């Protein structure tokens, strides 16, 4: 079995690419980083430092790479069995045309074997969003045929993979936590679902997408924003502050009540899931910087992301949300001159104030009681 994986960064190599290679799949990474691509071509392997209660180095083999902006990639995709991505939402739109060209080549050459595409991104139904972009480039005459043999499979992914340590000279060096979760929507595959250890199938994906979004992502981000305010550099330092840990735990409990109401998660099991995540945040072997976790605040304040979506769930079910509101307020105190979204958010905030800015990016009503509560929380955080 052959797979193309877009994104040879830390998540690509340390998570998805590793899972595929461990399953005996030949993986070709597609990326624009020539240093990483050339190293993968030269070595055909790399080491992953897996850290947790036990720290081990695991070798990933049977891999190579290709420039994702070159002409070769289209033919490689057309001849593959699986395409995965870990590139981020912005780049996902950029690679859509390449994937469309490959599907067109594949179908026009008479290849009727199934091809499944899985976007492993921090997005809700990211593969469905990718499909919408691909179909903009794919000739309309091929849409029906594509739907018969090309599967666009949504998933939920979870593994903390921080950037390489400063001073690291090996372009393929990567460190990951022990925990990983990759859950795919089994209803969207075309043909036989491949058996891949570390890839779990479900017919109720949204429950797991929102469990991860409302718990790991929500907790991670609020830890980062409160950590920045307290002067910490890392998630570990932040979550070891009892006041921050208390706020983050309470925020995850608030979002958890939404999940319990919506999907019927067992309350005790979900409480244990929250505790596991808090333990992951405190992993002493991961240098997970608050500036990295906090970046792109505009995207993270959007209606379907990790702050506003659980908040809207609490409003839907009439549940407490004070700690989620505190986390949203903290986003407006996040300043990072290296992050265009943080700069844009602060510029609009300075010009129009919190209520108008929050309403603009989140979809919340500017005159709502919720927005007023965020304003109050902001004042108490300043």
Curated annotation (Swiss-Prot):
UniProt GO cellular component terms: cytosol
Entry keyword NAD: yes
Keyword Oxidoreductase found: yes
Enzyme class label: oxidoreductase
Annotated binding of NAD(+), by residue: 3-14
GO molecular function: mannitol-1-phosphate 5-dehydrogenase activity
Reactions it catalyzes: D-mannitol 1-phosphate + NAD(+) = beta-D-fructose 6-phosphate + NADH + H(+)
Keywords, ordered alphabetically: NAD, Oxidoreductase
Pfam families: Mannitol_dh (PF01232), Mannitol_dh_C (PF08125)
E.C. code: 1.1.1.17
InterPro entries: 6-PGluconate_DH-like_C_sf, 6PGD_dom2, Mannitol_1_phos_5_DH, Mannitol_DH, Mannitol_DH_C, Mannitol_DH_CS, Mannitol_DH_N, NAD(P)-bd_dom_sf
One GO BP: mannitol catabolic process
Family note: Belongs to the mannitol dehydrogenase family.
HAMAP family, A to Z: Mannitol_dehydrog (MF_00196)
Name of this protein: Mannitol-1-phosphate 5-dehydrogenase
């Amino acid at each position: 079995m052959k797979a193309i994986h877009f994104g040879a960064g830390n998540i690509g190599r340390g998570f998805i690419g590793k899972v595929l290679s461990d399953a005996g799949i030949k993986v070709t990474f597609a990326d624009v980083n020539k240093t990483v691509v050339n190293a993968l071509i030269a070595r055909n392997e790399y080491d992953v430092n897996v850290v947790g209660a036990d720290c081990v180095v695991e070798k990933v083999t049977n891999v190579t790479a290709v420039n994702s902006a070159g002409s070769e990639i289209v033919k490689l995709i057309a001849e593959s069995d699986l395409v995965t991505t870990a590139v981020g939402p912005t780049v996902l739109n950029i690679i859509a045309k390449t994937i469309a060209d490959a599907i067109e080549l594949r179908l026009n050459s008479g290849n009727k074997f199934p091809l499944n595409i899985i976007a492993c991104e921090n997005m809700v139904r990211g593969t469905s969003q990718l499909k919408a972009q691909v179909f903009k480039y794919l000739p309309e005459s091929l849409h029906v045929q594509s739907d018969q043999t090309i599967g666009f499979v949504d998933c939920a992914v979870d593994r903390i993979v921080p950037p390489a340590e400063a001073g690291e000279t090996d372009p393929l060096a990567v460190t990951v936590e022990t925990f990983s979760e990759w859950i795919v929507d089994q209803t969207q595959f075309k043909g036989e679902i491949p058996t891949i250890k570390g890839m779990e199938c479900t017919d109720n994906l949204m429950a797991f997408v929102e469990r991860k979004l409302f718990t790991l992502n929500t907790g991670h981000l609020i830890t980062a924003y409160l950590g920045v305010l307290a002067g910490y550099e890392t998630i570990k330092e932040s979550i070891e502050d009892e006041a921050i840990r208390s706020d983050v735990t309470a925020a995850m409990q608030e979002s958890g009540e939404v999940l319990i109401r919506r999907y019927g998660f067992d309350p005790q099991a979900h409480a244990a899931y929250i505790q596991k995540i808090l333990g992951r945040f405190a992993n002493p072997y991961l240098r997970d910087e608050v500036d990295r976790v906090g970046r792109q605040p505009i995207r993270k304040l959007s209606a379907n992301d990790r702050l506003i979506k659980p908040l809207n769930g609490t409003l839907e079910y009439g549940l407490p949300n004070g700690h989620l509101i505190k986390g949203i307020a903290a986003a407006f105190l996040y300043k990072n001159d290296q992050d265009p979204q943080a700069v844009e958010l602060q510029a609009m905030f300075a010009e129009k104030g919190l209520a108008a800015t929050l309403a603009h990016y989140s979809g919340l009503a500017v005159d709502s009681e919720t927005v007023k509560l965020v304003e109050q929380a902001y004042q108490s955080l300043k």
